[in-house]
Amino acid sequence: MDILKVLSRGTKQAPKKPGVPAATLAQANIPSAGVETNPQLYHDNVGPPPKGKKRKRKSRTQDHDQADDAVDDDVELSDFDFFAPKTRRDSDGAGSKTKAADVKKAKKDADEADKARPIELDECKRILRSHRLKYTLLPVQKAAPAKVEKSSAKKKKKKDKGDKVDGAAQAAQGKSDKLPVFPQPLVSFSQLRSAYRISPRLADNLAKGSYKVPTEVQLGALPLLLQPGFALSHEGDGVDDDGKGGDGEALAMLQGASAGVDFLAIAPTGSGKTLSFLLPAINGVLKRRAEKGETGGDSSNDTKHALEAIVVAPTRELASQIANEGRKLAMGTGVRVVLMRKGMRVAAEEDSTEKKSEDQEEDVFESEDEDSLSEDDEEREKSEKPSKKPNKAPITKADILVTTPMLLLNFLSKGTSTTKKRLPRVRSLILDEADVLLDQLFREQTMGIWSACRNPNLRVSFWSATMASNIETHILDNLRAQADDAPAPPLIRLVVGLKDTAVPNISHRLVYTATESGKLLALRQLLHPASFSTTTSSTTTPEDETPLRPPFLVFVQTIERATALHEELKYDIPAAAGGASRVAVLHSSMPESARAAVIRRFRAADVWVLITTDVLARGVDFAGVNGVVNYDVPGSAAAYVHRAGRTGRAGRKGGIAVTFYTKEDIPFVKNVANVIALSERQAGAGESATQKWLLDALPDVSKKDKKELREKGVESRRSVAASKGKARITSKSAWERRKENNRKGAIEGSKRRKIAARDQGDGSDDGGEWGGIDD
């Protein structure tokens, strides 16, 4: 008799899969388990598809359609002869094999023809609504200014009131200019070959990369970027003009969209945006080569390569990741994807003063070296002046260039003010994390690159998980400014799900720690989970009780705090489990090689806890990260969305985002609480981790505080000296720190005294003969 079965007879246990241990089942629902999941975040049930698979024929009546259907049925039935004699098979079975192959080929051709046929408008709307995709045609052409009549006899109060009414009217007019569109969705990746005619090698690389189901952003973006004419080919060119309808200018813009569109995509983190812009860029290069009759298959032949696409990313890590993904996707196609490095030169055109600028550049190099040369070196330089010209790096041949803003801008602006390099052959400019690139920190650099791309057929695409309204306005203003010279292509915006919210497949926790010491204690409890929960909810759920398993990321506000936290935690993991090597730190002050080494170790699971700043908050893809710890409160709602998006990539469930906040953070934490509440509402969660009483109790954040927090972070953590030691990350008491500082001071003082005594002794020996002792 099994005593355990007897004692547990009255309890209900979860059914176990045969042959699978319970521990494995408990750990399977986390990102690092490697379980294959559906990458699509949304698949709502919005009703049955429209009845009938046949398209409506406008040129015929309903009776004719029914007659045609009857004829089709008769033809299908006539193909089968139920009373025909049984055919004799060949001895080798060749006839049956040939017939089976013909039937298979005919079926395949019919399937491809079916996939190449546009989907009906109603079905398009149903699919887009099911995946929560919303397209908007943004007005790029300048609208005629509205005539506002103002009376000179109005009083000041009435004038102010009239100005408010005019502003509201202009806002309503701007809203009405934005028309919804319903392009063709990408139902499966097999459509890319049949309907959108991408390169066969590119389709094979997609299959080898295990791309099976398109995500929401891929489902919505790829048709518009690959073949916008086909994507907008259904009735009304995709414009829903039955409600407000009738914007003839917008209709005309969409009818000319076959040459390409400008695109703005706002999609959740980890939803496949990189593939969405790399695939059209590579296919565009191959398509233009085919039109010119160039194969470009031999990568050693540099004459085939011309810079046609530029991808700009805000950080080195993200740029390196994009370049690696591009090389995998372009393998065997002859398209060269290059990551720009310091000192690299790319193909660019200059003005007529190119020769003059080179001479001036040589003079600059020579003038810099003159101060460090001796007289003999100067004479030798004069005799060998022709051979002392600075050696320039060879021009790198690339089809697609991946870069950070400053690297490319330094190359374009290198030289004197009379030389301006241009990139006239670039036809595609891609801004990944566009809200950061067009913010104040990178705006000047990004606009310098944008203005250098002078191709009249230039198409610009903007990608991010968050997009503020002022960034959208800035994009529209720049596109309108360029529309003065030539007709502007249409700008289509795609929003996946709710704007500026975190991914719905992760859970969120807000933990109040009161002080900095409480943060350190809470983080150590995550490293060594206790039997109790650390959530603030009054009702705990199984998700709240789930411990955070490594690997995970820890985000802090400054480099100084990242280094201090690493010193505190590096010995918390036992030596038997790897010890200090399991905890690493990464920030922008580290050399590029050291940062790359840390990233490699983290991807290889040699590092379990990676402490970092916001340098890793955007774009970097770690598939197996189980969670994110916001040790310091993020500076904005967008920063929280991107930090939390490092887990739960590609639809993986089980990720956890933990945020610590102290007494000093209470005035600023409501931004994070609002994002958590919206994200859980979007996911359809029953009970939110952010209780309503907490949202009501937290104070609202003013615009001034939001701006200061976004630019500089929480004031008390900017430096230890400014906070009078309150923001110090340490587990030592004040007495221990004082004793340690006194010991260090005593050692330093002893060293100084020894050095002074030695110097004094050396000085006394330098004199002449000893003259004896004075009386």
Swiss-Prot record:
<comment type="function">
    <text>ATP-dependent RNA helicase involved in 40S ribosomal subunit biogenesis. Required for the processing and cleavage of 35S pre-rRNA at sites A0, A1, and A2, leading to mature 18S rRNA.</text>
</comment>
<feature type="compositionally biased region" description="Acidic residues">
    <location>
        <begin position="68"/>
        <end position="79"/>
    </location>
</feature>
<dbReference type="GO" id="GO:0005524">
    <property type="term" value="F:ATP binding"/>
</dbReference>
<feature type="compositionally biased region" description="Acidic residues">
    <location>
        <begin position="762"/>
        <end position="775"/>
    </location>
</feature>
<feature type="compositionally biased region" description="Basic and acidic residues">
    <location>
        <begin position="708"/>
        <end position="718"/>
    </location>
</feature>
<dbReference type="InterPro" id="IPR044764">
    <property type="entry name" value="DDX52/Rok1_DEADc"/>
</dbReference>
<dbReference type="InterPro" id="IPR014001">
    <property type="entry name" value="Helicase_ATP-bd"/>
</dbReference>
<feature type="region of interest" description="Disordered">
    <location>
        <begin position="708"/>
        <end position="775"/>
    </location>
</feature>
<feature type="binding site">
    <location>
        <begin position="267"/>
        <end position="274"/>
    </location>
    <ligand>
        <name>ATP</name>
    </ligand>
</feature>
<feature type="domain" description="Helicase ATP-binding">
    <location>
        <begin position="254"/>
        <end position="485"/>
    </location>
</feature>
<feature type="region of interest" description="Disordered">
    <location>
        <begin position="1"/>
        <end position="113"/>
    </location>
</feature>
<dbReference type="GO" id="GO:0016887">
    <property type="term" value="F:ATP hydrolysis activity"/>
</dbReference>
<dbReference type="Pfam" id="PF00270">
    <property type="entry name" value="DEAD"/>
</dbReference>
<dbReference type="GO" id="GO:0003724">
    <property type="term" value="F:RNA helicase activity"/>
</dbReference>
<dbReference type="GO" id="GO:0005730">
    <property type="term" value="C:nucleolus"/>
</dbReference>
<keyword id="KW-0067">ATP-binding</keyword>
<dbReference type="GO" id="GO:0030490">
    <property type="term" value="P:maturation of SSU-rRNA"/>
</dbReference>
<comment type="subunit">
    <text>Interacts with the U3 snoRNA and is associated with the 90S and 40S pre-ribosomes.</text>
</comment>
<feature type="region of interest" description="Disordered">
    <location>
        <begin position="144"/>
        <end position="177"/>
    </location>
</feature>
<feature type="compositionally biased region" description="Basic and acidic residues">
    <location>
        <begin position="99"/>
        <end position="113"/>
    </location>
</feature>
<feature type="domain" description="Helicase C-terminal">
    <location>
        <begin position="533"/>
        <end position="698"/>
    </location>
</feature>
<dbReference type="InterPro" id="IPR001650">
    <property type="entry name" value="Helicase_C-like"/>
</dbReference>
<protein>
    <recommendedName>
        <fullName>ATP-dependent RNA helicase ROK1</fullName>
        <ecNumber>3.6.4.13</ecNumber>
    </recommendedName>
</protein>
<feature type="short sequence motif" description="DEAD box">
    <location>
        <begin position="432"/>
        <end position="435"/>
    </location>
</feature>
<keyword id="KW-0378">Hydrolase</keyword>
<feature type="compositionally biased region" description="Acidic residues">
    <location>
        <begin position="359"/>
        <end position="379"/>
    </location>
</feature>
<feature type="region of interest" description="Disordered">
    <location>
        <begin position="346"/>
        <end position="396"/>
    </location>
</feature>
<dbReference type="Pfam" id="PF00271">
    <property type="entry name" value="Helicase_C"/>
</dbReference>
<dbReference type="InterPro" id="IPR011545">
    <property type="entry name" value="DEAD/DEAH_box_helicase_dom"/>
</dbReference>
<dbReference type="GO" id="GO:0003723">
    <property type="term" value="F:RNA binding"/>
</dbReference>
<keyword id="KW-0698">rRNA processing</keyword>
<feature type="compositionally biased region" description="Polar residues">
    <location>
        <begin position="26"/>
        <end position="40"/>
    </location>
</feature>
<keyword id="KW-0547">Nucleotide-binding</keyword>
<comment type="similarity">
    <text>Belongs to the DEAD box helicase family. DDX52/ROK1 subfamily.</text>
</comment>
<feature type="short sequence motif" description="Q motif">
    <location>
        <begin position="191"/>
        <end position="219"/>
    </location>
</feature>
<dbReference type="InterPro" id="IPR027417">
    <property type="entry name" value="P-loop_NTPase"/>
</dbReference>
<feature type="compositionally biased region" description="Basic and acidic residues">
    <location>
        <begin position="734"/>
        <end position="761"/>
    </location>
</feature>
<keyword id="KW-0694">RNA-binding</keyword>
<keyword id="KW-0539">Nucleus</keyword>
<keyword id="KW-0690">Ribosome biogenesis</keyword>
<keyword id="KW-0347">Helicase</keyword>
